[in-house]
Amino acid sequence: MKEYWTSLASLLGVLAFCQSLMQSIFPPELRFAFLKFFNRIFHVFSSYCYFDITEIDGVNTNELYNAVQLYLSSSVSIAGNRLSLTRAVNSSSITFGLSNNDSIVDTFNGVTVLWEHVVTQRQTQTFAWRPLPEEKRGFTLRIKKKDKTLILNSYLDYIMERANEIRRKNQDRLLYTNSRGGSLDSRGHPWESVPFKHPSTFETLAMDPRKKQQIMDDLKDFAEGQVFYQKTGRAWKRGYLLYGPPGTGKSSMIAAMANYLGYDIYDLELTEVHSNSELRKLLMKTSSKSIIVIEDIDCSINLTNRKKNSSNVSSQRSYYDAETRNGSGSGSGGSGEEGGNGNTITLSGLLNFTDGLWSCCGSERIFVFTTNHIEKLDPALLRSGRMDMHIYMSFCNFPSLKILLKNYLGYGVEDINGDVLKEMEMVVEKAEMTPADVSEALIKNRRDKEKAIRELLEDLKSRGERNVKDGKLRGGSGNLTELEVVEEQEKRAIDSQNEDEDHDEEEIELEDNICKTRED
């Protein structure tokens, strides 16, 4: 044994001497060329081929990387020896993942492949036009050369299908918001996310059942309409405008839509977006099967009716697109600073965000705008193709009142005295109480259901009498039905749009006459 260790020590000494001799005789370039040649010879005689899937592809996140990560997370819990366990805040499940620089064996159609999760430190960059993550992440797929042509394409297609299936089954939807001031997170993403666990559904939503069914049918047709949109040459997207008084359930409607379709939500805070280009970058980083929300759009930036701000619009206008002309002016889109925060988003930038060329960089996405005052919005935001469906979130009516009684008290129509029910039906329209007001009245007395019914009826009566006395019913328009209110509000917006178009045509005609005079 002693002789063995002596021989081993002598051999190591010889190897160390040879290494130092090679480093002193052969330059680094020659050694590098030799290693490169040796690797090529090794790969020629190797029976395997390797495929690298990096996390970031150019400026965008590699969708295949995300799909592989999701696919392997469903199998490593069974087959992996070393796992990475994570659980997000407010999440209801633990996520399994492959540890850094660890590997796992997978089988597809009888062929065995090897996946390795490669994580290396990124070299410090002296200059970069955008920050990159400190770590380079990727997966390496090892397949035998003889199996490459047999399974590679079908295996990757299978991974994409399985990843989409896992996303659909995953109950933890995500709620995203854009980072403050356009900053990026540690992975270079402009969106921050938390698990979305809002309990609102269409069953609990206080709204006329016929209207809810109409919205649900429209959402279902959209989600199943990929072939239809391709056949008609339209981008696979849809826009919804939710408008009505505060407390009528606009946010609950958005949550119900997300839960019904299983989509993630991107809550876009426009006041944190400083330019049109930044808005486009945010759009590029959104995923398919998502709802992009801009709440209270009339309050976010200056996108109100251009006619009301016509005195601030620049006199130098293009001849071709009235909407883009006015959107880039200082009065409509806020070119220049908005509120002193350097916000230069224009109306044309927002319109291109919703239905321009950049809106087609993804598919199966829904845009939802909310506002309390539809008449204040610029008519360019309201036309079909941008906001395809206008949904009026009304005051509490009798059908929605019955839903609230069922939700909060567990009372059906048959559980309430008939005379009391008739009184409620007679006064609920005149009271103009929002679903939020009715819900609060029921919540505070939910332990005493009879008292809750009694006090709610008294509140409905007193508010109805006060509205009739003060002439405030339906905003002073008299006792109008919900349909008449919707028609009246949208008619005002359309009339405003026609007036703007007439005003633009007059200016274009005047400019044409000036040009002709100069030519003569």
UniProtKB/Swiss-Prot annotation:
A UniProt-annotated Pfam family: AAA_assoc
GO molecular function, one term: ATP binding
Organism listed in the record: Arabidopsis thaliana (Mouse-ear cress)
Regions of compositional bias (Acidic residues) in chain numbering: 497-512
Positions that bind ATP: G244, P245, P246, G247, T248, G249, K250, S251
Cofactor(s) needed by this chain: Mg(2+)
Enzyme Commission number: 3.6.1.-
Signal peptide location: 1-24
UniProt similarity note: Belongs to the AAA ATPase family. BCS1 subfamily.
SMART domains: AAA
Region (Disordered): 307-340, 467-520
InterPro entries attached to this UniProt entry: AAA+_ATPase (IPR003593), AAA_N_dom (IPR025753), ATPase_AAA_core (IPR003959), Mitochondrial_chaperone_BCS1 (IPR050747), P-loop_NTPase (IPR027417)
PANTHER family: BCS1 AAA-TYPE ATPASE
Keyword ATP-binding: yes
Biased composition (Gly residues): 328-340
Name of the protein described by the UniProt record: AAA-ATPase At5g57480
Main enzyme class: hydrolase
GO biological process, one term: response to stress
Record's keyword terms, sorted: ATP-binding, Hydrolase, Magnesium, Nucleotide-binding, Signal
Catalyses which reaction(s): ATP + H2O = ADP + phosphate + H(+)
